[in-house]
């Protein structure tokens, strides 16, 4: 009932011309592949999509292996502790020398596919989303060192 209620609010916002950001999987990924599984929120919204609304898929690559990901431990990092460590790393690296990672963000209009697969059902729709997110293949974790003055890679 909660998901249906939220989906209705999102559909009404789209009908009113507002932009809405949805994260279909609703969680951090457990691997280098996105897994939508049996989630239903995005499917419910796209199944009732107002005629003039557009769906823009956003694929992000380069974050798997960051201190915010589950790549190292398999568990979600503690937000407060990770945030404090991040502040320490910025200060310890004299702000300008923080090791950086290449992050790619790709936006693509996937309206036609979402409308088509939403009409076919939740599972085909979710498989379509997974195929979009995972099109480049499985992302390998990249563990960067946290201090510019330490030799080697990883942490």
For each feature predicted by the language model, list its residue ranges:
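Surface-exposed alpha-helical segments enriched in charged/polar residues
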Residues: 8-12, 44-47, 134
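Active-site metal-binding loops of divalent metal-dependent hydrolases
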Residues: 26
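Short, cationic low-complexity segments
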Residues: 122-145
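Generic alpha-helical structural signal
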Residues: 4-8, 43, 126, 130
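A cross-family acyltransferase "interaction/gating" segment
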Residues: 18-19, 30-120, 146-153
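Soluble or luminal CAZymes and related metallo-dependent hydrolases
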Residues: 2-5, 37-38, 124
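Membrane-interfacial amphipathic helices and adjacent loop/beta segments
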Residues: 1-18
């Amino acid at each position: 009932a909660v998901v249906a209620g939220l989906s209705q609010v999102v559909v009404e916002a789209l009908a009113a011309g507002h932009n809405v950001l949805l994260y279909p999987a609703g969680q951090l990924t457990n691997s280098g592949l996105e897994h939508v599984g049996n989630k239903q929120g995005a499917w419910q919204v796209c199944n009732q999509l107002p005629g003039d609304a557009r769906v823009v898929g956003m694929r992000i690559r380069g974050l798997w292996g960051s201190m915010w990901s589950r790549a190292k431990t398999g568990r979600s990092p503690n937000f407060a502790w990770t945030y404090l460590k991040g502040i320490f790393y910025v200060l310890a690296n004299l702000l300008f020398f923080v090791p950086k990672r290449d992050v790619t963000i790709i936006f693509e209009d996937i309206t036609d596919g979402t409308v088509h697969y939403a009409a076919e059902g939740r599972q085909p729709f979710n498989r379509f989303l997974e195929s979009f997110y995972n099109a480049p293949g499985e992302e390998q974790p990249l563990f960067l060192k946290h201090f510019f003055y330490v030799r080697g890679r990883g942490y």
